[in-house]
Amino acid sequence: MKEQKYNAYLKEIGKFIPKDRIYTDELRLLAWGTDAGFYRLIPKIVIRAKDENEVSRLLALADKYTLPVTFRAAGTSLSGQSISDSILIVAGKNWEKYSISEDFERITLQPGIIGARVNEILKPHGRKFAPDPASVKSAMVGGIVMNNASGMNCGTHANSDKELLSAKIVLADGTRLNTGDPESRMTFEKNHTPFLNKIIEIRDEIRNDNELSDRIRKKYSIKNVTGLNLLPFVIYDDPFDIIAHLMVGSEGTLAFLSEVTMKTEHDYPYSASAMLYFSNIKDACRAVVAMKPGPVFSAELLDKKSLASVNDTTGTGLTAVLTETKADTPEELQANIEEIKKILSPFETVTPIHFTDKPEEYSKYWAIRSGIFPSVGGTRRPGTTVSVSYTHLRAHET
């Protein structure tokens, strides 16, 4: 029965999608069966969609035949978000259009633009794309936003949720909505009143529960990308704003993101970084807390296992804090460095505090930080998981 549904779906999409953009052969299905992670699911059909109209029709037909759909942009996810054993819709190449507002403070992006490319576009205007995951040179906007991939510098103050202004989406039944367009909102409100009423009902239910509302605020004051994003129900009154921000971190489970308008951030032209070494992790953590009110833009803690994984020879059992400061002028940068040194004066560092403003030097520090995840993973002893050894798992088998 299921096979018949896929065959019927294939027949119908063949009427508007060229054959060279539909993959059903064994070899290519195998190739598309994995992303950057180590999971594998073999899709039944892979479709390279060209535009929003095609996606809308593809989803409407999938809804008609009750067939699951997964979306993929670059496929740099590590947790299997962009693999499928059903229908895989790819929106990478040909989804690279963008527009910038006259004041350069907003940028509208299609999902197939690589994050680093967005920064290249904005750099001449002194602006940047705030989310900066380690995979920013490969990850595309669609995946960055839908996975709420934040990265090393944007923290929670400038992640996708904070930067998003509006979204153009396609719902599971093929319905299109642009939350930033009054006409689209009006049409959606007219045709989907019960849907909007349900959003409002959930919003009010959450807000009327003070304990739950406080817990949500607390959870999202720190990095939190687990599960669906509940913060919009607490923050926004307008149901369309709630819908737009629900997309962030939804991993494509709620809708297809065909376009997103986001705030841009000021790009400081001068920066300096230092690798600060402490004899123990407690001192390192205390130093991070002390630096928080200062002109510190990022402080990344690298524990002894992380340092060992990249063959750091400074010492054994140390903890490092990779620290960065930025400024608009060289004078401001030097003043920032001196202020940070003053803040750290009560702390004993293993090596003298040395900030470098040379890109060829500090880029090596950040390259180390970006590569920590696979480096640490490579040191894991075979037969172990991140928490429990396989032998212990077997001991509890029934």
Regions found by a protein language model. Give the residues of each.
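N-terminal flexible segment immediately upstream of the FAD-binding catalytic core
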Residues: 1-60, 64, 74-105, 134, ...
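Generic non-transmembrane alpha-helical segments
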Residues: 8-19, 57, 61-65, 121, ...
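Flexible, glycine/charged-enriched surface loops at secondary-structure junctions
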Residues: 19-26, 72, 129-133, 206-227, ...
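FAD-binding subdomain of flavoenzyme oxidoreductases
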Residues: 97-100, 107-111, 115-288, 293
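Phosphate/diphosphate-binding loops
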Residues: 152, 156, 162-165, 278-280, ...
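Conserved small/polar residues in nucleotide/adenosyl-binding loops
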Residues: 391-398
